[in-house]
A protein has these predicted regions:
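Catalytic-loop of the protein kinase fold
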Residues: 200-215
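Protein kinase glycine-rich loop
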Residues: 90-96
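Activation segment/activation loop of eukaryotic-type protein kinase catalytic domains
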Residues: 216-251
Length: 378
């Protein structure tokens, strides 16, 4: 391996900034760098935009490479693994769509413990995906992202547990119901900020909904449950109007996830499908109701594919839905994924200093809140 590098060795540094570089090439270049003192010296001497570009490359491509290796080899970095005997499970707290949830303690601190449910035939594939997703989640660091503390593993993949900080205020819907005076627009601004952070890193959440947005002790919204739907092998669902075996997730799913063949999709969550779900979260938080709440007997799969979307609330303005916000939310529900705005559009609106929150006197109840249960303007 050549160890000649200098400020004029433009090809070496150009490789680091090439978007199209493959994982094998990335590994080769990083190996070349780490095994060559002169190249390390050059790297340390970078300044300004060059230094930023180099750091961004390592951050972005290094994470991608690490996650791919972990998936291929069914391994997790040792620093992520928590000592099992230091974990104390106290009691079952709930049963989500794809995981059993308990609360407990790790080293004396309260934690949430999730055990992903896996079927025997799919356990190897799901475990590999889990290794990949955990690497990405552990890498994330943002005030509106739920921190991953680590994982507890054994030789049995069915015993794989994910540990995160315990959020005492529950999810955003529980918190809003318990605190009717809370500024829901501020909570939504925090959620959108978190999603924008993920998408900037090209990380897709894949299961955005109120139940997966938690609230910490300071009242700050934090997004959690990254990729659990995809990890569970549910990136594509069978069309069914009679079952809801996906933890209610179908109520937030975009058309291209519900019927990939029709929309030319591979059925995997994308930033665009996240944005569709984000629009549903806005509706959910401001109204206090699940999207398509009037469809109590079956999921809204066919309704969504017919172009139907939640109808405008009867008292939209009092709930925080200005005409501008309602039109914006509807744009996130576009049938065409490419027509959906990025989270920045919502951030621009929610960051307006003139925007104020006035709690409504009454929130919708029993699902009777709209002029019409669905709109079909798409």
């Amino acid at each position: 391996m050549s160890c000649e590098a200098g400020p004029t060795d433009t090809q070496f540094w150009a490789n680091f900034y090439t978007v199209e570089i493959t994982s094998d090439e990335c590994l080769s270049e990083v190996g070349s760098l780490l095994n060559c003192s002169s190249k390390i010296t050059v790297a340390r001497s970078l300044r300004g935009n060059e230094a930023q570009a180099f750091v961004d490359f390592l951050d972005r491509r290094g994470l991608r490479l690490l996650s791919k290796i972990c998936k291929a080899q069914r391994i997790i970095p040792a620093s992520y693994v928590l000592q099992g005997r230091s974990i104390r499970v106290r009691r079952a707290h709930g049963r989500g769509g794809f995981a059993d949830v308990s609360n407990g303690k790790y080293l004396g601190c309260p934690v949430a413990i999730k055990r992903l449910r896996m079927h025997e035939g799919d356990s190897d594939r799901i475990f590999r995906r889990l290794c990949q997703e955990v690497v990405v989640w552990k890498h994330l660091s943002h005030p509106n992202i739920l921190p991953l503390l680590g994982v507890s593993v054994s030789t049995d993949p069915h015993c794989f547990r994910i540990l995160s900080e315990w959020m005492p205020n529950g999810n955003v819907m529980q918190y809003a119901r318990s605190n009717p005076e809370v500024d829901r627009l501020q909570l939504l601004s925090e959620v959108v900020t978190g999603v924008a952070y993920l998408h900037k890193l090209k990380v897709v959440h894949g299961d955005l909904k109120g139940a997966n947005i938690l609230v910490d002790s300071a009242g700050t919204a934090r997004i959690g449950d990254f990729g659990l739907m995809a990890m569970a092998g549910l990136s594509t669902i069978f069309l069914s109007e009679t079952t809801d075996s996906f933890g209610g997730t179908v109520y937030w799913m975009s058309p291209e996830l519900l019927d990939p063949q029709r929309f030319g999709s591979n059925g995997r969550p994308t930033c665009e499908s996240d944005c569709y779900a984000l629009g549903m979260v806005i509706y959910e938080v401001l109204t206090g109701l699940r999207p398509f709440h009037h469809l109590n007997a079956y999921p809204p799969v066919f309704a969504v594919l017919r172009g139907e979307r939640p109808g405008k609330p009867l008292d939209a303005e009092s709930l925080g839905f200005s005409d501008t916000l309602w039109e914006l939310v509807q744009s996130y529900w576009s049938e065409s994924s490419s027509a959906r705005p990025t989270p920045q559009r919502l951030l621009d609106y929610l960051s307006d200093p003139s925007l104020t929150w006035v709690p409504p006197l009454v929130y919708p109840a029993n699902g009777i809140d709209t002029n019409s249960d669905v709109s079909s303007s798409l």
